[in-house]
């Protein structure tokens, strides 16, 4: 939608499936190395993993940052450019990965739900103006009236920062906005996704429902 502003909160959005032959090691790597490694980068606030119950890819990782500036530091460039051998191996095991670095342009409610709905808004939503962002914020406020819906976030990918992963399809990448709906139950996530899709004129194929696996916050590192 609107051009990303570096002072807005950011999210690194990584959605992928994994090679079934190496899925155990893939999850071990994510849980024991990768999430902590990313959350330790200055400016990162949390790393959260989800597993899909409905959608095109099985695993989603969300890494929240104070701002998009966190993706332009020497610490981030070092982590992204100098992957560990374990990371190199598992990045190649990703199947149909999707990496986006996004600004959070509209946010309603608060917190992290046990369930998450993900809606891709499609190419027509790219480059829309501030009024469209305000409209998404208003939609989020409406969805909060559904019992169990606790937060919504509109993510706008930054074209410069959203470089593809090694196994990601380079041709025809669409950096469309993404709408996240956090909920305390699966039924609430589904109801909100259906309501949002109806309001936005999307079809069910653009909805995904995921369950929370675990979350690591930057504050947890100091408590350990």
Where are these regions (language model features)?
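Macromolecular interaction modules
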Residues: 1-224
């Amino acid at each position: 939608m609107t051009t990303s502003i570096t002072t807005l909160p950011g999210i690194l959005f990584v959605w992928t499936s994994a090679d079934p032959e190496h899925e155990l090691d893939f999850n071990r790597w994510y849980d024991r190395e990768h999430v902590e490694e990313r959350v330790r980068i200055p400016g990162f606030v949390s790393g959260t993993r989800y597993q899909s119950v409905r959608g095109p890819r099985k695993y989603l990782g969300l890494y929240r940052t104070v701002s998009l500036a966190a993706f332009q530091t020497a610490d981030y460039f070092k982590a992204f450019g100098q992957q560990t051998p374990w990371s190199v191996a598992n990045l190649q095991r990703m199947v149909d990965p999707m990496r986006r670095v996004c600004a959070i342009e509209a946010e309603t409610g608060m917190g992290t739900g046990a369930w998450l709905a993900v809606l891709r808004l499609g190419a027509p939503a790219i480059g829309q103006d501030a009024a469209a962002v305000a409209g998404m914020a208003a939609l989020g406020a409406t969805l909060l009236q559904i019992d169990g819906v606790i937060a919504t976030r509109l993510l706008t990918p930054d074209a410069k920062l959203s470089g593809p992963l090694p196994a990601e399809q380079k041709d025809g990448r669409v950096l469309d906005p993404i709408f996240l709906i956090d909920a305390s139950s699966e039924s609430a996530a589904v109801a909100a996704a259906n309501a949002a899709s109806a309001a936005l004129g999307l079809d069910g194929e653009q909805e995904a429902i995921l369950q929370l696996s675990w979350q690591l916050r930057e504050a947890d590192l100091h408590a350990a």
